[in-house]
A protein has these predicted regions:
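Class I SAM-dependent transferase core
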Residues: 1-76, 109-123
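Residue-level signal for inorganic ion chemistry
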Residues: 36, 89, 175
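Conserved SAM/SAH cofactor-binding pocket of Class I
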Residues: 63-148, 158
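Conserved beta-strand segments of alpha/beta enzyme cores
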Residues: 100, 124-126, 170, 192-195
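Short beta->alpha hinge that forms the Motif I/post-I loop of the SAM-binding pocket
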Residues: 105-109, 153, 176
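Active-site capping/gating segments
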Residues: 127, 176-215
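A short glycine-rich, Lys/Arg-flanked "PGG" loop and its adjoining helix->strand segment in the class I
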Residues: 158-170
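Conserved beta-strand signature within the Rossmann-like core of class I S-adenosyl-L-methionine
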Residues: 168-178
């Protein structure tokens, strides 16, 4: 998973989502990519084939999440894993005053990895190491958007995010090709307004945006 090409035209040419990033953001993402490669040797952070294409499969894919709610700077990322999309969001907004991303992850080794990336990139993020069921009830403060990727079915995600969406946050959930099966009548006809956005990195994937009706 070499990032040497970034010294020439890569990663800007890898995907449109990367094209307009400031040099400092690209530098931080390159640090992130190198740490992924280093830590992957000891712990399973993500599938090896996906890390071979980390700039598109993970970084660009994560960038479209924050792009979907462009005014949000205070995020909550559920089940952060190796940091997609939450840590990428934090790196994107690293130089913006007031930006903060809460990363919730139960695996302590992954939490250690996330902390290492935060330290090396100065990303504005806080790690909450523990299960969602224990962390979320005690989490206070302004949250403008809630993200999750490859974590749980939509109904379960909404149970986790309900408190924050009811307070005005927007849920942004990355879903695969079977996402339509998760759009039950109870969700689409309930108190939430659901918007589907086509993924810019995978033709079969979608972003599911969830807002409180009237919010």
């Amino acid at each position: 998973m070499s990032v040497a090409k970034s010294k020439e035209s890569f990663p800007r040419s890898a995907h449109a989502l990367l094209a307009d990033l400031p040099e400092e953001t690209l530098r931080r993402l390159e640090i992130y990519a190198n740490l992924l490669e280093k830590w992957q040797r000891a712990i399973n952070l993500a599938g090896k084939s996906s890390l071979d294409d980390v700039w598109v499969r993970h970084f660009a894919d994560s960038l479209q999440v924050s792009q979907a709610v462009p005014d949000a700077r205070r995020w909550l990322d559920l089940g952060s894993g190796a940091g997609f999309p939450g840590l990428v969001t934090a790196i994107k907004y690293a130089d913006e005053p007031g930006a903060l991303v809460h990363l919730v992850e139960a695996n302590r080794r992954k939490c250690a990895f996330l902390q290492n990336v935060i330290r090396e990139t100065s990303a504005p993020a806080i790690i909450h190491c523990g299960r969602l069921e224990k962390i979320l009830p005690a989490l206070d403060g302004k949250i403008e958007a809630v993200s999750a990727r490859a974590l749980a079915p939509l109904e379960a995600l909404l149970r986790y995010a309900e408190k924050f969406v009811d307070q005005g946050a927007v849920g942004v959930f990355s879903k695969g090709k079977l996402f339509e099966a998760e759009l039950t009548d109870s969700l689409t006809a309930g108190k939430y307004l659901i918007t589907i956005i086509a993924s810019q990195t995978c033709s079969a994937a979608r972003l599911v945006l969830v807002r409180r009706r009237g919010g």
